[in-house]
Amino acid sequence: MKYVFYLGVLAGTFFFADSSVQKEDPAPYLVYLKSHFNPCVGVLIKPSWVLAPAHCYLPNLKVMLGNFKSRVRDGTEQTINPIQIVRYWNYSHSAPQDDLMLIKLAKPAMLNPKVQPLTLATTNVRPGTVCLLSGLDWSQENSGRHPDLRQNLEAPVMSDRECQKTEQGKSHRNSLCVKFVKVFSRIFGEVAVATVICKDKLQGIEVGHFMGGDVGIYTNVYKYVSWIENTAKDK
């Protein structure tokens, strides 16, 4: 089902004032977590590992990589089953904190121009830094249930103090906040907000309890790098 929203109401869905102009943005690290429930987006961080929000732990999960367009095949398409899913130890469905999980793929993804891992952040990002937000949307000709179009936009990172003053940010720990400065609208399918990439490194990933407004709240990946690296060790 598709709805009309505004960027200030639901962050992370990507659309244009002129819906006749659509293009595929480069975001080869994005993977689509396909299930019988709501769509979710993850990030390939190693050929065998995907980082995703823990609330995306869904039945019959399949990981889709490469080209997502069902009517156009280009040889980059891959669908891989998970063999292990590890949620962050402190995650709870009742709170927005620690909303991370790692997915180990049954076999390594085959890397190509549309399938590439993304490096994890090594430092906290400075407030005011303009970062890239990546997500998935529905192309104009797609009337199906699953998104098929990678989309990017830019937004500045807020300071922790600014974030804590907002309705969305005050209840989040280990968060990263961005300020949306443009509002466009068109009909689109609801999809997860996905990622924040700063200086070509994964800095933030969506949380599951978005509250609306013009501020996007993300889990600060840098705060969890030790857990991610220890869990996703290639044996």
From Swiss-Prot:
Residues 20-233 form the Peptidase S1 domain. It is linked to Patients with unexplained male infertility (UMI) show a decrease in the number of sperm cells compared to fertile men. Sperm exhibit also abnormal activation of the proacrosin/acrosin system and premature proteolysis of ADAM2. Disulfide bonds join 40-56, 131-198, 163-177. Testis-specific. Expressed in spermatids (at protein level). GO terms for biological process: binding of sperm to zona pellucida; cell migration; germ cell migration; positive regulation of acrosome reaction; positive regulation of fertilization; protein maturation; proteolysis; regulation of protein processing. It holds the Pfam family Trypsin. Plays a role in male fertility. May have a role in sperm migration or binding to zona-intact eggs. Involved in the activation of the proacrosin/acrosin system. Its main location: cytoplasm. Keywords: Cytoplasmic vesicle, Disulfide bond, Fertilization, Secreted, Signal. GO terms for cellular component: acrosomal vesicle; extracellular space; nucleus. Gene3D superfamilies: Trypsin-like serine proteases. This is Probable inactive serine protease 37. Residues 1-19 form the signal peptide. SMART domains: Tryp_SPc. Belongs to the peptidase S1 family. It comes from the Eukaryota. InterPro entries: Peptidase_S1_PA, Peptidase_S1_PA_chymotrypsin, Peptidase_S1A, Trypsin_dom. It is found in: Cytoplasmic vesicle, Secretory vesicle, Acrosome; Secreted.
